[in-house]
Regions:
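Residues on the lipid-exposed face of transmembrane beta-strands in outer-membrane beta-barrel proteins
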Residues: 228, 332-336, 366-372, 458-464, ...
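Residue-level recognition of beta-strand termini and adjacent short loop/turns
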Residues: 47, 66, 86, 375, ...
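Solvent-exposed loop/turn segments connecting transmembrane beta-strands
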Residues: 355-357, 611-617
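Short, small/polar-rich motifs associated with maturation and membrane association
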Residues: 1-367, 379-381, 385-387, 457, ...
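Conserved C-terminal beta-signal and adjacent last beta-strands/turns
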Residues: 8, 333, 769, 849-877, ...
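Transmembrane beta-strand segments that form the barrel wall of outer-membrane beta-barrel proteins
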Residues: 347-353, 601-610, 759
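Extended, hydrophobic alpha-helical segments in both membrane/secreted and soluble proteins
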Residues: 200, 366-368, 474, 517, ...
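Surface-exposed loop/interface segments of Gram-negative outer-membrane beta-barrel transport/assembly proteins
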Residues: 100, 116-118, 233-313, 354-361, ...
Length: 1010
């Protein structure tokens, strides 16, 4: 019995020894991507109950099976799984969760913060609102997405740029564009609008002084911070994404309702009859008589048959503009990472044909983002973007013969429909007899225009963490481009008398580069777990160089060699060369404190020195303070299930603006024409050594609330006062100079931003969201350059500086309508009366502005399983534009003297007493007055997309493709407006005439993930 017991004990002990031999002790350290230890991370051996948490130094010790797999996790970080087979010690780096990164913003040189902990006014647009849009202009995708950010794409030209404004127009003469940062490096707005949209991870818009003052003078009009995509450390596999899309473009708006050939002849016949008879009433017999007179006496018989009926009836809009222009785009990106290094590489090619004849764009983009942590105290990185762009440009500024008739846009409207396109042999005509101009379809053949642009932008940085909480960083950023523009006119260009005989060519070169060297030290410390401090100190140096060269020649005799070397003489005077250089140096600092994530305060100082001002005024000190109360984190609200977020914030600060020419503080000379074999020199500008910084003071008060974790509302009030505005002060003409740079006047922008986001429904398979933005901005001049001066005409006869009104305010002869008794146009006189004599009409301040006081957008997103629908709208309200096109297409004078076709609005003319008409009797000239000033408000379906992502279990069967997404979409598909021009958005430039139309796109795309 005893023997059996002993043997049994030996057997049990043997099994226990074997079991113990299969377990082992593993130690390790868990850190974040900066090498900081993560305290409290959970370490678990999968499939067992063995687990522990990391201590104060991020270290752990755990006994686990010999071949166990450890799962390491921590809130806000991606879970890592590591096999311990053959290992007794492991070091693990946890990267932030991808979903969390989207809610992190980088403000003012420091490390990222959660949006909810930012005092300043900041809005974020995520990548899904930007990528895969059928446009080569990435900025266009931001329209309507951020309250207070106004994006206007004024035309559809392939290389055009959008205007960008944050909280209105901040100055009369200085730069009004926001600072653009790409991964922290400053770039030109033109560079931003050419980068690959699929490289963008997020766009952060900084709007108030607390968020922007740290950037100094360049951020006087706000900041747009663009973050590009990166790889992730410890990524198990390489992610490869291949995207391709095909789009078709057409003009965004249908043509104006232009007259047919018979309608045009009847209309002009009516005008002829009225002018011959003096009787404004037009009857069918009088119209027929006037029509025949017009045909016989204006050389139109060759376009008519024996019965004086037109042999052709072309809709020139359809011939010139109504075409589907294709766009092809392909994008390839590769991302991944090891324990120490993350990387992202991408390449993009886009080819887009314009809707105007002769316009085409080829663009190549390449990007490299590399980030490596050499050890726990050293981090290195490089972000680099390269681009090449070639575009053939449709010249919309060319005029020949009658005004605008060679401009393809205007020609599509005004070319008479009876003008044939082909000769008797079926060959396309190269010259139109009716308009005495080149066939607009062939303008690009005779007058080629093209542009090349090479861009480079990037930043290299080194980051040190010598002690816990201290980050020292040095970065060097570069933004550069080379631009070349070529234009020519062939000696074969047809004219009324034959051909030009000699051609011409011109070349323009521009080279721009800017480098920025930034050095910062940031220290973060938490004391007693509730007192959180952050201190930042920095220094920054910027240098900018911009030079250009242009030359033109004439006398080219061969259409085969249209370049400047083939000319016999230089045209337009001597070749021109210019170089502009500027530099600035800044020092700055910021202190931030929050108590238990409830009470936040911050303060910052920045001193800027700029070479654009004289020695006595080069330095300027700017500052900002801000505070926030996160009420949700109070004990009385922390557990409230209804209110999931509630905070109040306020900030006040000063900023400066140096966005003027580089040498306005100096008197300088320029080369003039040659005289006696020598180049002459002349004083080119009057310098102002007392020129100083334009200053701004900005107050912002805001509140954020979120209910049930699904409905959020943000509201902010702002007031931005600009003083000592930089502008050219008008001088007496007798002095020989039109103006001199100075600091004068004041301007105020005040308004409200509203942002709403509502997750209407969310379940396992369904998701429905609605979002909206709204901005009201009141812009007004507060004073001008002389005490008591309240109103000054701007010199263009259209606009004025007016204290108390928006800048600029429209100021024209005020049209008072057509007199029902006489059929004559009437206008306001200086004493407020009415006159039918245009020479007695006064210039009147109409109190309306070019810029809209109300802007916004809204959209919906709905998803069911793998199917999703997105629709985004944008709108503006209250802006006015001069619809100059109406002067040419609703004007009997233009129809009669130049044979310009007319639109159907022209039929609304006065004939007899009592008529209420828009246009006067047909023997009266149309004048340039406020009748052409129209409200350019609009609502536009900016983008819509229907997409389907195939289920993952289907993709897994391929063993190769991880994901597949297919979509169809459209841009600018629907517009509601009362504007009578081609496109209300084109009215952004103020005077709308011959503008390359905006485009609408239909697109189809595929995205593969490998």
């Amino acid at each position: 019995m005893i023997k059996k017991i002993v043997l049994s004990l030996i057997t049990v002990l043997s099994f226990c020894s074997l079991a113990l031999a299969q377990n082992k002790q593993v130690t390790g350290t868990v850190t974040d991507e900066k090498g900081e230890p993560i305290i409290g991370a959970t370490v678990v051996a999968e499939g067992t109950s063995a687990g522990t948490t990391t201590g104060g130094d991020g270290q752990f010790t755990l006994t686990v099976p010999a071949n166990a797999t450890l799962s390491i996790s921590f809130i806000g970080y991606e879970t890592q799984k590591v096999s311990v087979a053959g290992k007794t010690h492991i070091d693990v780096t946890l990267g932030e969760e991808a979903t969390g990164i989207e809610d992190v913003v980088v403000i003012g040189y420091g490390t990222g913060k959660k949006i909810g902990s930012v005092i300043g006014s900041v809005d974020q647009v995520k990548s899904e609102k930007i990528e895969n849009r059928p446009s080569t202009n990435v900025v266009d995708a931001l329209q309507g997405q951020v309250a207070g950010l106004q994006i206007m794409t004024g035309n559809g030209e392939l290389t055009s740029t959008s205007s960008i404004r944050i909280h209105g127009l901040g100055s009369m003469g200085a730069d009004t564009s926001p600072l653009i940062l790409l991964d922290g490096a400053p770039i030109q707005a033109s560079t931003l609008q050419t980068i690959n949209q699929n490289d963008i991870a997020s766009v952060n818009v900084l709007k108030d002084a607390s968020a922007t003052s740290i950037y100094g003078s360049r951020a006087a009009n706000g900041v747009i911070y663009v973050q590009t995509k990166t790889g992730r450390r410890n990524q198990e596999s390489v992610d490869v994404t291949l995207t391709g899309q095909y789009s078709m473009s057409s003009a965004v708006s249908p043509e104006l309702n232009m007259m047919s050939a018979n309608e045009m002849l009847d209309y002009i016949g009516a005008a002829v009859a009225v002018r011959l008879s003096g009787d404004a009433l037009t009857t069918p017999d009088k119209i027929a008589s006037g029509r025949q007179y017009f045909i016989r006496n204006f050389g139109l018989a060759k376009f008519m048959d024996e019965n004086y009926n037109p042999m052709n009836d072309y809709k020139w809009w359809n011939e010139i503009l109504e075409r589907n222009a294709p766009m092809y785009q392909v994008d390839l990106s590769v991302s991944g990472g090891s324990a120490k290094t993350s990387y992202y590489f991408s390449g993009n090619y886009a080819n887009k044909t314009g809707i105007l004849p002769g316009s085409e764009l080829d663009r190549y983009n390449f990007r490299t983002n590399i980030d490596t942590r050499a050890n726990n105290w050293l981090r290195l990185g490089l972000n680099l973007g390269l681009g090449y762009q070639h575009s053939s440009v449709a010249d919309t500024n060319e005029s020949q013969g009658s005004l605008y008739v060679s401009n393809p846009v205007m020609a599509s409207l005004i070319t008479p429909p009876y003008q044939p396109l082909y000769d008797d042999n079926g060959q396309m005509l190269n010259f139109f007899d009716a308009t005495q101009a080149i066939n607009p379809l062939m303008t690009a053949d005779y007058m080629p225009r093209w542009q090349n642009r090479i861009t480079m932008n990037g930043m290299a940085f080194i980051e040190l963490t010598p002690v816990k909480g201290l980050t020292i960083r040095s970065s060097l950023a570069v933004d550069a481009f080379d631009w070349r523009s070529h234009g020519a006119s062939s000696p074969e260009t047809p004219t009324p008398s034959g051909k030009f005989g000699t051609g011409s060519a011109s070349e323009l070169f521009q080279r721009f580069y800017e480098w920025t060297w930034t050095n910062t030290a940031e220290y973060k410390h938490t004391w007693n777990e509730v007192h959180n401090f952050t201190a930042l100190l920095g220094e920054e140096t910027l240098y900018r160089n911009n030079n250009s060269f242009s030359v033109a020649s004439t006398g080219i005799t061969s259409s085969r060699f249209l370049n400047i070397a083939m000319g016999t003489e230089v045209s337009g005077g001597l070749p021109t060369y210019s170089i502009a250089q500027s530099a600035s140096n800044s020092v700055f600092g910021r202190l931030e404190y929050n108590f238990a994530e409830r009470y936040f305060i911050s303060g910052l100082l920045r001193n800027d020195a700029s070479s654009r001002f004289g020695e006595n005024n080069r330095n300027a000190l700017f500052w900002a303070v801000g505070g926030m109360w996160n009420i949700k984190n109070e004990t009385f609200l922390r557990d409230n299930q209804t209110i999931s977020d509630l905070s109040l914030k306020v900030s006040y600060g000063t900023q400066g603006n140096s966005g003027i020419g580089d040498y306005n503080h100096r008197q300088y000379m320029a080369a003039g024409s040659a005289y006696g074999g020598y180049t002459t020199w002349m004083v080119s500008g009057i310098g102002n050594p007392d020129l100083m910084w334009e200053s701004q003071n900005t107050l912002t008060v805001g509140a954020n609330i979120e209910l049930w974790r699904k409905l959020s509302l943000s509201i902010e009030y702002y007031r931005r006062q600009t003083n000592d505005m930089l502008m050219s002060i008008p001088l007496a003409p007798s002095g020989g100079y039109s103006g001199r740079a100075g600091n004068v006047g004041g301007m105020r922008n005040s308004g409200i931003d509203l942002s709403l986001n509502y997750d209407i429904y969310a379940s396992k398979d369904w998701f429905v969201n609605f979002h909206a933005t709204f901005n009201y901005n009141k812009n007004q001049l507060t004073d001008l350059w002389e005490p008591g001066l309240e109103f000054v005409y701007m010199g263009n006869g259209l606009q004025a500086y007016s204290v108390g009104d928006p800048f600029p305010t429209w100021t024209m002869q005020e049209w008072r309508g057509v007199d029902p008794e006489t059929g004559l146009d009437t206008w306001t006189t200086a004493d407020g009366g009415i006159t039918s004599n245009f020479n007695q009409a006064a210039l009147v301040n109409l109190g309306t502005s070019l810029y809209a006081p109300y802007t916004g957008g809204f959209g919906v997103t709905a998803a069911w399983k793998g199917l999703s629908l997105t629709a985004d709208f944008s709108w503006v309200h209250g802006n006015y534009a001069l619809n100059n096109t109406m002067y040419f297409v609703a004007n009997a004078d233009m129809g009669l003297s130049s044979q310009f076709n007319q639109c159907d609005l022209a039929w609304d003319y006065w004939q007899q007493e009592g008529d209420q008409a828009r246009y006067p009797r047909l023997d009266q000239a149309i004048n340039f007055d406020s009748r052409m000033l129209e409200k350019a408000s609009f609502l536009r379906l900016k983008y819509i997309q229907l997409a389907y992502t195939l289920p993952s279990h289907i993709m897994e069967k391929t063993k190769f493709i991880k994901g597949l997404k297919v979509w169809v979409g459209g841009r600018n598909l629907w517009t509601v407006t009362g504007y009578n021009g081609l496109d209300p958005e084109a009215a952004e430039k103020g005077v709308d005439v011959d503008t390359y139309p905006n485009t609408r796109e239909f697109t189809f795309g595929l995205e593969f993930k490998f």
